[in-house]
Amino acid sequence: MSAQLDKEYPTFRHLFEVPTLKSLNISSDTNESIYLCGNSLGLMPKSTRKAINDELDTWAQQGVEGHFSHPERTPWVDIDLPLLPLMAPIVGAKESEVAVMGSLTSNLNAMLMSFYKPKGKRTKILFEKHAFPSDYYAFLNIVQLFGYDESHLIQVAVQDGATYLRTEDIIFEIENNAEELALVCFPGIQYYTGQFFDIKSITKAAQDHGICVGWDLAHAVGNVPLNLHDWNVDFAVWCSYKYLNSGPGAMAGIFVHQRHTENNSKTSYNPRLAGWWGNNAQERFQMKEEFNPINSALSYRQSNPSVIDTVAVKASLKVFQEANGIQFLREKSIKMTQFLQDLLTQSQYYINQNEKPTKLGFQILTPLDPNQRGCQLSLLFHPHYDEKSKNIMEQVNKYLHNRGIVCDERRPDVIRVAPTPLYNTFAEIEYAVKSLNEALNQIEN
């Protein structure tokens, strides 16, 4: 069946460098690994190396003149601007609503400084329990900067016996705490469970009460289609090294709805962490002691972008363009993850989400509804230890790795498996599940 599906759904694997068993120090075999870890770090597009080397050559040959007089490509002073029409459709935004800048948490902190506006009783931030720690630190830091403590952070927890949050529970907490909320901020996709939140409904529920809404889209961008402008999201932040395949620690991105920037002027603009690269480009090098923000999300930039980082992001975004865009890839992604789910639920070691674990096996933490997830399935292994006091999850992951299957482990007991439509195949998924069953069988016997 996997062979037929691979014929129906093309792969763009040829555009990527895929680690081999030899390069991963697994064996001397030069065959490519099965890389199911794009949710942690995407593979390198083959075009990235040339894109970076070209700019290194320009630096060597032009020096400072590369800023304004590039021999072949965009001068460095505008190096990030060609990325806007490539990034905007991936997040469902207007070009004026996106900027490629900074890193994920630095951008989140910048957005919080601008959009967290405590006033009167409205001082609190609502977000998920067990959020990615960096987000928690940012939320705690911003309330402390305004003189509050952690009691001004409201966390929505999963109900007892459930593995992920329900939209109605989030909306209930918004409505129940509306008079005290200054900000609601959730992830588009939960990093641990892989749950895809209902961004449109949650945003509307909060804004109906006059509450600002932001989103951390680290695991959503390049994974699922987004419509940030139409959903009326106030702001969003994301990284680009996961599904966008821009490289470890690569430059990140922001979305700011046009209603917050289109009327920017010297005397009227949203307070922010400002810098000269957010200033009107025509006045930037006049060195005036006057901030005249650009009428777009670019006004949130602080410093000139790293050229090397920027061209790496551009190379990765061009891959999405060549692959016919995120909507096209989503169709294949839904099919792949459903194929993975079907194989897993057929395993003798599968334990239903609502079942109390009493045997060796795994549960799927991720919603089984394709519309409530991206490409990732998170597998929770039981029990924690075997009879020899060895961690089950770690044994399974080691078995998979020794067979050239790269997944992401989250201690103590979870393996995240993320078949990525750009470069993974159905045959790889089939082999990975077969190997997982073999690993558990070996532990059992």
UniProtKB/Swiss-Prot annotation:
Catalyzes the cleavage of L-kynurenine (L-Kyn) and L-3-hydroxykynurenine (L-3OHKyn) into anthranilic acid (AA) and 3-hydroxyanthranilic acid (3-OHAA), respectively. Pathway: Amino-acid degradation; L-kynurenine degradation; L-alanine and anthranilate from L-kynurenine: step 1/1; Cofactor biosynthesis; NAD(+) biosynthesis; quinolinate from L-kynurenine: step 2/3. This is Kynureninase. PANTHER family: KYNURENINASE (PTHR14084:SF0). Gene3D superfamilies: Aspartate Aminotransferase, domain 1 (3.90.1150.10), Type I PLP-dependent aspartate aminotransferase-like (Major domain) (3.40.640.10). Homodimer. Its main location: cytoplasm. It is an enzyme of class 3 (hydrolase). Belongs to the kynureninase family. Its cofactor is pyridoxal 5'-phosphate. Keywords: Cytoplasm, Hydrolase, Pyridine nucleotide biosynthesis, Pyridoxal phosphate. GO terms for cellular component: cytoplasm. It is found in: Cytoplasm. GO terms for molecular function: kynureninase activity; pyridoxal phosphate binding. Pfam families: KYNU_C. Pyridoxal 5'-phosphate binds at residues 104-105, 132-135, 216, 219, 241, 276, 304.
